[in-house]
Amino acid sequence: MSMYEEGLKLLEEKFGNGKDNVIALATIAQEPSADGGGPQPVVRDVNAYYENGVFYSVTYAKSCKMQQIAKNPAVSIAVCFEWFTAIGTGENLGWVLDPKNAELRNKLRTVFAEWYDKANNEEDENCCILAIRLTKGTLNINHWEKLYHMDFVNKTTMENGGVF
């Protein structure tokens, strides 16, 4: 098994299998920074479901994060307290009740069952699914004992390091 495949297996064990993960999601603000410089990063915690290199979250299409992703889909994530950081692309998959989202919606409702109905109004067409498609990431095992630098696009290990 390659380092990349080993890393994927560990990601599935840690974050997959129907787990509700809390991740820090960073996007790029639409407005310039307070000092007049370029756009600045904005970070918030979201609940996310992991499957095959993608984290999924249910959110509101008119939220700041979704507006930011619409203008610049580059995102960065960290799984809280799990030593996994990654960069990727955010994508609005549309309304949760769109028939194309039925299978994924059922998974999300199951994973987030404890709080899903309290936090989401599915009748509102702005209740949407955010897909965070990972492009590169680093999984840190036992405080730097072993690092998995993964390139999800090319499905390989990055030999010269990764995302810290």
Please annotate each region the language model reported:
Residues 85, 89-164:
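Charged, gly/pro-rich active-site loop segments
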Residues 20-61, 67-69, 75-79, 86-89:
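Short beta-strand segments
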Residues 18-25, 110-115:
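Short Pro/Gly-enriched beta-strand edge/turn motifs at strand-loop
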Residues 16-20, 29-41, 93-104, 137:
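Intrinsically disordered, low-complexity coil segments
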Residues 1-22, 157-159, 164:
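Extreme N-terminal tail/first-helix region
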Residues 52, 81, 134-136:
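Residue-level signal for tight coil/turn positions that link beta-strands
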